[in-house]
Amino acid sequence: ALPISPDLTKEQRNGIIEGARAICSKVNYTGAGTVEFIVSEDGTISFLEVNTRVQVEHPVTEAVTGVDIIAEQLRIAAGEPISFTEDPHSTGHAFEFRINAEDILNGFAPCPGTIVSFEPPTGPGIRVDSAVRSGSIIPPYYDSLIAKLIVWGPTRDVALRRAKHALREFRIDGV
């Protein structure tokens, strides 16, 4: 799955927001979490699941809302109120690409080793979340995720152009 912020109608977006609110209200949930819905090709929205933790895809939501979800989660855990009082508005379109150390010619098997060179892309609407750098070792024991590339644009087309450019610019050698 490619985490994206889909183009939704106002009615679809409001339905998702109200559905998520109703679920959280019913169980008196306070904190950061994820209420997931799936949108079919015909526009039908279906509830998928609830997670009482932040998902790996949270930067997509951060990109389109401007809300630092992790900072808000820490505020709530510290007993502080969230930093905003109105619902965040979604703007633009965002994609998240998971950059993994995998062997595409061997069924995407993990590809451990030492990262010789790590050169992430930069530019408007480009965010890279990673804890590796040149010289980092990717062990065979854990998830092969190296980085998450999050790309935002004011429109889907701009976001796609930026994503294509960023993926061409991303350089990782050694694994």
Task: Identify the meaning behind each predicted range.
Residues 1-175:
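ATP-dependent carboxylate activation and anion-phosphoryl transfer catalytic cores
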